[in-house]
Amino acid sequence: MTEFVVLIPARLDSSRLPGKALADIHGKPMVVRVAEQAAKSKAARVVVATDHPDIQTVCQAHGIEAVMTSNRHESGTTRLAEAAAALKLPPHLVVVNVQGDEPLIAPELIDRTAEVLVENNVQMATAAHELHDFDELMNPNAVKVVLDKNRNAIYFSRAPIPYPRDAMRAGKREMPSETAVLRHIGIYAYRAGFLQRYAEMSVSPLETIESLEQLRVLWHGYPIAVETAKEAPAAGVDTQEDLDRVRAVFQTV
């Protein structure tokens, strides 16, 4: 398998759950739990990229490498671009972006996302899973993605895509039957050199409208390969309820 590293963007500020990166999960801060899960993958190296010295301190106390970055980044991807430059990562090295609020992420998904990038010889790869719930289709917090025949992303949206026009006209709460509906999973793989290119790209109006950083890549004409996971991954932590759920999982381990 191609060598890759995991970079974990972790900022202290969070609008819905302040300080969540340091939230305790069964005796360890969440960012440490995420890094420990990532270390179970085949990654050659796991590094946390943070904007706060408290996060760097707790990571280092648990033997986890951490690098300081600016607190002015508006996306995790630009934060990782700064981290990759600071770490002097070779341009062709594969980097997997694991979100800092995913303490239950499957190591196998990390490995597979890196593999998809290499197999498809693209600049960026991500993942998705099939969605079967109508309420989730309509939920703007559930990001959907539609693919072309080559399994590359056509578009990501918070809106219901593909839109079941006939069913909606008839007032029916039905999922599209002609194709699978896919929910995006927030994990990315890219070459370290492409991270720098991303940071230099102009901001896409689409990414601003949808608040989805991956749309910058599509808008600038780069394909994004998408792996369809066999099952939905464990949800990340955005709210206190999510945190309570994850804590309960770790209490049973």
Swiss-Prot record:
Q: List the disulfide bonds.
A: none
The signal peptide stretch is none
Q: Which class of enzymes does this protein belong to?
A: transferase
Under which name does UniProt file this protein? 3-deoxy-manno-octulosonate cytidylyltransferase
Offer an example of a GO molecular function term for this protein: 3-deoxy-manno-octulosonate cytidylyltransferase activity
Give, as in the UniProt entry, the pathway in which the protein acts: Nucleotide-sugar biosynthesis; CMP-3-deoxy-D-manno-octulosonate biosynthesis; CMP-3-deoxy-D-manno-octulosonate from 3-deoxy-D-manno-octulosonate and CTP: step 1/1; Bacterial outer membrane biogenesis; lipopolysaccharide biosynthesis
EC numbers listed for it are 2.7.7.38
Catalysis: reaction(s): 3-deoxy-alpha-D-manno-oct-2-ulosonate + CTP = CMP-3-deoxy-beta-D-manno-octulosonate + diphosphate
Tell me what gene encodes this.
kdsB
Q: Which GO terms describe its biological process?
A: CMP-keto-3-deoxy-D-manno-octulosonic acid biosynthetic process; lipopolysaccharide biosynthetic process
| Location within or outside the cell | Cytoplasm
Query: Which species does the entry assign this protein to?
Result: Neisseria meningitidis serogroup A / serotype 4A (strain DSM 15465 / Z2491)
